[in-house]
Amino acid sequence: MRFVQKIAQFIKEKELDLGALTIIVPSDRAINKIKQELSNLYSIPILSPQIITIDKWMRTEDKSKIDPTRQLITLHEISAQLAPFKDQSFEEFLSWGNTLLKDFDEVDRYLLDAKAVFKNLKSIKELETWQIDDEELSSSQKKFKEFWGHIPELYTRFNKRLQKDKKTTSGRAYRDFNDAIIDEASRLTGNHKFIFAGFNALSISELSVMKKLIDKKCAFFLSDADTFYTRDSIHEAGSFIKKNHEFLNVDYPIPLLKSIDNKKMNITIVECSQQIGQVKVAANELNNLSVEEQNNTLVLLCDESLISSVTKNIPANIDKTNVSLGLPITQTAIKSWVDILFQIQENKLKFGTESIYFYDFQRFINHSVTLSCTSIQEMYLLGDIERDAIKKNRIFQSIEAIKISDLMSEVVGLTFENWNKDWKKALSNIRTLNSVIIKNISKENSFERTILQVFDESLVELQNIIEEGIPEMNQKSFKLFFDQHWSQKNIAFKGDQKEGVQVMGLLETRLLDFKHIIALGMNEGKLPATNQINSFIPMDLRAALGLPTTREKQGLFAHHFYRLLHHCDTLTATYSSNNEQLGPQEKSRYLLQLELELQRINKNINITNKFYNVPIEKASSENAQVIEKSELIMGRIEKHFNRAISASSINTYLRCPLDFYYRYIAELGEEKSIEEDIESQQFGSLIHNTLEKLFDKHALFDSLGNENIPKPRALEEVDLNQMLIDYKALLYNEFLNYFDNESQLFLEGKNLVSYTIAQDTIENTIKKELEFLKKQSEPFYIVQVEAKKEISLDVLVSGQKKTIHFKGYIDRIDKIGDAYRVIDYKSGKVKEADVKFKLKDNDLLVSFTNCKHAVQLALYSLFFKHSFGAYPNEAIIYSLTDVSKMDHKLSYANHNLTDICELFETFIEEVLNEIFDESSSVEHNEKSKYCNYCQ
């Protein structure tokens, strides 16, 4: 017989008057069950007794309970009147205010003398700071001592204020109810009876109330326990039960069970390598249940963070499900939405601009809350703005630019308006924003509407508090204050408590019994929970005062768990061994106790250990790094080579054919984003651009090859000395343009280092040029800078002539006397092997691959020949970061540049024949780094 049935049986056997009976239970879930059992037991219509939770029963009707946020504000107002706390900021107060309120609550709940408790605490703290010598205490040590000395006064003033406002805390309500219980009992009719059913861990105030009624012979105390754990003096599951009966001086009106010792039960313990694996195990178990079994099945969430995954993975065969513990709103998109709203304000303060920081804009437009009220057209327009910002590296975005519709204008205005530390305005904006979004959320986004509504409802009381006035605080403090208020809210699920699979947390299961239990998250640290007790009262003093210590806090879960075994036939318990999750990866001690203790005593218990790994679906191809050249892909290759190609595309193919395929054939490009910190490529571009502007005015031809008029004279020392003056303004403008006119982004922090290095690099380069110029006996001309070049080469591919077009930009062409040089700037280091060409085993593909810059310099030499009729005398890489060895010339043993260029044309033909070979596949080069698409 289940415990709720025994309660009903007890009432009937005692012939208790249902109209003069109050049944007090630990939680709401048991109320309907008891009513149902009473209805089943009595064959005639009955008047239901009052059935109420102990928390509701012990609240005084003349005082309303004050919420935690108001408690905090009230305590702060009181503390500000006392000398040690007058100069404290609200942020400093937050570091201790919540903890002290919890201690006040426990002192009341356990009927302790507050003055004595905090006097003891003061003595302990003084001992901790006691010094053996006579050295005078520092000012901070004096403040520390004063703090502990004023806690009793804080407690007294706080309670007087509550009394004046006709408010109460949970703990104070329990203390007051204990004082008034005899009057309350006398107020009821003479034969009124009370039943306290299914309690485990109780505070002194609760026990004291019960004892007073039991001593008056008008109350019964009914425990749901088994001799397996009550007869053992050290078993934690029975410790509270025995203490309760000793304190109340009562026996067991409902005899203890003797079930766990000899009952049959199948226990399966499943180790899961992934957190989600536990949910999959539950889904598999539920899938095998009959309809009858479903009505007797509990999914127990020892790790309540699994609730969202569990509700999404309930199999289709489960007719009815009731989820009782609620989805914490912090496990929804609201948490990240709130973080975005506050981060926007944080960055407004940080950057001192009314514009929108790009990453705030990006997070905002891609967040599910924004998307839930955004039309398809608005999404496209916002996406265009995002892509344009990335293309132009626009770190800050104009607010007006994203007001693309009436709705978006309103949403953007409310989201990005400056709060200016006006918290009344901040909350008003957030609530108005909630209202606008809720009103415009599409039908298919009903979940987003629900979470926003729950979030908004939680802010109503906070808005009232702020309207009444709150202390001055900074944004960080307001965020803590704000989060504390809304983060405890849950989203209730709809369901039938009478039928179907029940999904609960451990506390909701009190008084309820199930035949089939699926317990998820049974890791040590989750069950029992190892949450630290947040208290100023040390553990040894807590133990001496009778306050719960960590041991008691953990021990109360033991009875809740073992009680579920009373009527259980099958238990499937999972735990995660995933190293990436927070907390221990071991199975709960309760599972170890079942294996090591219970199985030894009860031979009818069958325990099986299993391992579950989420199956990984096989990919469509055995090797994802292989692309076969289908007709479609060959068409794309043909299309690519019908356009002009660059040296970098050929080099990409040499490094990794698969990278070449993704970037140039599939045209995925590279993942782009806004860069706040200058990467090497962009850093080099800014230096290149500055050098181009410095030398362009001295060039004989413009970038397209048109002759500049008037014709510039040869470069002289005076020109380079002027460059040493001009470069700073040019470089500054390059950086300013790159950072979208936000100079503070490169005049401080990490980017200032890059800016300084860029200045040094250009100055050293010009000085090196000046040194080089002084050594020349013939005129030095700048022929062209950033020269745009194109050529076409005819090659044989699979026996057929194919014309390949090349394009590129030569950083600089210069002339000393009659000798021409083509120069490419590199902001990185250059090795000798990068420009020293070696023909290895007559394999041109390997040879050009091994000489990093050979393809580029050979192609640039061909560009030069096409424009000027002959090859240049030298093809050079300028290493801007190593001025000691700045010019690195392309060389080939005893050969000249012409020989390399002729080999290059043959090499291009070989590369293209390999690329156009339909029988070969595109594969990743194992020696190459993986690109984003190969990973």
Can you say where each PLM-predicted feature lies in the sequence?
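Conserved motor-region signature of P-loop NTPase helicases/translocases
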Residues: 1-48, 54-56, 183-353, 512-513
